[in-house]
Amino acid sequence: MLFHLFYPLASNLKILNIFKYLTFRTIYAMITALIVCFVLGPWIIRKLEGLQARQVIRTDGPESHLEKQGTPTMGGLIILTAIILPTLLWADLTNVYIWLTLFIIVGYGLIGFMDDYLKVVKKNTKGLSARQKMFWQVLLAGGVAVFLYVTPGFNEMLYVPFFKNFHPDLGIFFIPFVTLVIVGASNAVNLTDGLDGLAIGPVAINAATYMLFAYVAGHATLSAYLQIPRVVGAGELAVICGAMVGAGLGFLWFNSYPAEVFMGDVGSLSLGGTLGVIAVLTKQEILLVIVGGIFVIEALSVIFQVGSYKYRGKRIFRMAPIHHHFELKGVAEPKIIVRFWIITIILALVAISTLKMR
């Protein structure tokens, strides 16, 4: 909005030329997101408390979690507001990738909102069924996949980090692959969101990493020099990534241990889906497995736990996702959280190193 309002006036007022610079708009999207969190956060938390939108704590989990009973949830509304508003203010709204990403943010946010609303406000403990959530997730992600598949100029090749000459053409299989990336990322972040600040920290780190890759992918000279796929217009996604970083840090102010609010499904499903679609649009889908390694480990721990119990009658972990396993082993919650953040930072550095290791 500000880009379209002020940049056309740059011919009369030279200082407004600054709006054409992606770095400037990305930084201010980040700052704006932080401000939105700090201004709206306390108000939204009070409203959630007034609605009795309080987290239901599992009785079969770690005993320390019983202290969290009564903490308001659905705080993802703070995050989504802090991402959407700065994006609308600072991004180039003629860019189709911006609208595809906003489509996933809002769409997956609505799925999570309905699930949270039914569970914590309407006191329907089941919320949306797993099938209902999966149906809508696949439908929205599939819609994005089909749109990209039929869009001229967007290739269906799969680019693999560390291998500059290996990029198989997925053809029609591009559609289910994209759907899997978006849905998988969404649910992996959702599974990770079990401790105070555990999910939002890695989400912010992932967003910062993709902010760099989006900028490079959209830059003709840098993408050619670093030999990563050039995606015309993808650089604008750095603005959304910047807003995600700012929103993540702003929400962490309230969500850090001991949390004043939880993000709920409205936040986790939407944030995961957003990371997935950005990975697809920047042609860095495989990179998400590296930088989002914590999310992958959390998801795999659940899959292995369920599979082992179903076919062997034995559990691999004391409890899944794996962060609960460490809790039951006696590791303090803050230590688990910070260690997972450290691992994510290391994985982000490995992911960034792929820019040169090709």
Swiss-Prot record:
Its cofactor is Mg(2+). GO terms for cellular component: plasma membrane. It is found in: Cell inner membrane. GO terms for biological process: cell division; cell wall organization; peptidoglycan biosynthetic process; regulation of cell shape. Pathway: Cell wall biogenesis; peptidoglycan biosynthesis. It comes from the Bacteria. Pfam families: Glycos_transf_4, MraY_sig1. Keywords: Cell cycle, Cell division, Cell inner membrane, Cell membrane, Cell shape, Cell wall biogenesis/degradation, Magnesium, Membrane, Metal-binding, Peptidoglycan synthesis, Transferase, Transmembrane, Transmembrane helix. Its EC number is 2.7.8.13. It catalyses: UDP-N-acetyl-alpha-D-muramoyl-L-alanyl-gamma-D-glutamyl-meso-2,6-diaminopimeloyl-D-alanyl-D-alanine + di-trans,octa-cis-undecaprenyl phosphate = di-trans,octa-cis-undecaprenyl diphospho-N-acetyl-alpha-D-muramoyl-L-alanyl-D-glutamyl-meso-2,6-diaminopimeloyl-D-alanyl-D-alanine + UMP. InterPro entries: Glycosyl_transferase_4 (IPR000715), PNAcMuramoyl-5peptid_Trfase (IPR003524), PNAcMuramoyl-5peptid_Trfase_CS (IPR018480). The chain crosses the membrane at residues 26-46, 71-91, 93-113, 134-154, 170-190, 197-217, 234-254, 261-281, 286-306, 335-355. The keyword Cell wall biogenesis/degradation applies. It is a multi-pass membrane protein. GO terms for molecular function: metal ion binding; phospho-N-acetylmuramoyl-pentapeptide-transferase activity; UDP-N-acetylmuramoyl-L-alanyl-D-glutamyl-meso-2,6-diaminopimelyl-D-alanyl-D-alanine:undecaprenyl-phosphate transferase activity. NCBIfam families: mraY (TIGR00445). Catalyzes the initial step of the lipid cycle reactions in the biosynthesis of the cell wall peptidoglycan: transfers peptidoglycan precursor phospho-MurNAc-pentapeptide from UDP-MurNAc-pentapeptide onto the lipid carrier undecaprenyl phosphate, yielding undecaprenyl-pyrophosphoryl-MurNAc-pentapeptide, known as lipid I. Belongs to the glycosyltransferase 4 family. MraY subfamily. This is Phospho-N-acetylmuramoyl-pentapeptide-transferase. The lineage of its organism: Bacteria, Pseudomonadati, Thermodesulfobacteriota, Desulfuromonadia, Geobacterales. The gene is mraY.
